[in-house]
């Protein structure tokens, strides 16, 4: 998240003892495609493989970085900025942290069984681990076609709810509709900076995707890239994703950086790959666990618009983090 701010010329002064790397880049030496169960044959000692499956150790319970009273103060400040016309929507981030060391392979396997998502990933490095069940595609490029799928709208599942009832809720809810329309317009604008005029279009508008604990309100947008657009041009135009920031993007980022006292680290950043033919795929890092320096961090953010209610948005952050928190039980 922090390095994406720098790309837009936005300075971030805040730091904390839990600050993570600004960016990590890998060049893969081996790519393995798994289509069925696998067996490992190696000259390495068994203990070397066992190190990949060390048990999770939980040393302290999770704590929320800001309580509701503090959240409400930030919410009220942003509500005033919205009334003054400085921003139209803004996403407030909260974090859950505990002291722990995790087995990322086990966590990822369990997460995929219970809450599989299209942009999921797992990284196990000697210094840190990341486990994510992100549902959001920020950027998918194949040839000269580019696609983004912003998510704006979240509904907690109940025993009686289904996709049809969720879609009816979103379409009849003025707040959710406003929020979704603003984010879609911003993502269309971001795409237009790098696409041939007239080619940016909505492929599928306002549909529902279903997950274990919630429903999401999604729109798919595409465009045809202008000739000469570089990887840097595309990344700078599209990142960070508007659906997890708010709009307008630059001013909203500035307002967030004034009130959020800790780095977001990986949260609302992006993970993905770039091929040698310049095709690429990047997600938005949400629904994720960062384990670094024996601390696990789970972040969530919900949107504030003119008619938002602080308590509802605060509780929505918990709903979004719930499936990840359950992994530690």
Go through each PLM region and give its residues.
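Extended alpha-helical targeting/anchoring segments
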Residues: 1-329
């Amino acid at each position: 998240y922090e390095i994406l701010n720098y790309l837009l010329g936005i300075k971030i002064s805040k730091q904390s003892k839990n600050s993570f790397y600004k960016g990590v880049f890998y060049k893969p030496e081996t790519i393995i495609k798994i289509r069925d169960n696998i067996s490992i044959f190696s000259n390495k000692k068994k203990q070397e493989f066992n190190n990949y499956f060390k048990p999770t150790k939980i040393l302290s319970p999770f704590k929320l970085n800001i309580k509701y009273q503090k959240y409400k103060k930030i919410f009220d400040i942003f509500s005033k900025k919205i009334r003054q016309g400085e921003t139209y929507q803004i996403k407030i981030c909260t974090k859950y942290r505990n002291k722990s060391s995790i087995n990322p392979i086990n966590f990822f396997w369990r997460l995929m069984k219970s809450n599989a998502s299209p942009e999921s990933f797992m990284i196990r490095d000697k210094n840190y681990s990341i486990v994510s069940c992100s549902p959001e595609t920020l950027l998918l490029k194949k040839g000269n076609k580019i696609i983004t799928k912003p998510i704006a709208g979240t509904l907690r599942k109940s025993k009686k709810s289904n996709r049809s009832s969720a879609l009816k809720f979103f379409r009849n809810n003025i707040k959710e509709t406003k929020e979704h329309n603003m984010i879609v317009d911003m993502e269309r604008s971001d795409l237009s900076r790098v696409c041939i005029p007239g080619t940016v279009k909505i492929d599928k508008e306002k549909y529902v995707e279903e997950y274990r604990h919630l429903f999401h309100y999604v729109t798919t947008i595409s465009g045809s890239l202008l000739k000469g657009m570089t990887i840097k041009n595309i990344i700078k135009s599209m990142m960070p994703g508007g659906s997890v920031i708010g709009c307008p993007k630059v001013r909203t980022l500035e307002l967030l950086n004034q009130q959020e006292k800790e780095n977001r680290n990986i949260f609302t950043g992006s993970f993905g790959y770039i091929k040698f033919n310049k095709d690429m795929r990047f997600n938005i890092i949400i629904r994720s666990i960062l384990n670094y320096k024996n601390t696990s961090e789970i972040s969530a953010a919900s949107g504030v618009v003119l008619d938002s209610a602080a308590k509802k948005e605060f509780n929505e952050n918990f709903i979004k983090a719930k499936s990840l928190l359950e992994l530690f039980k």
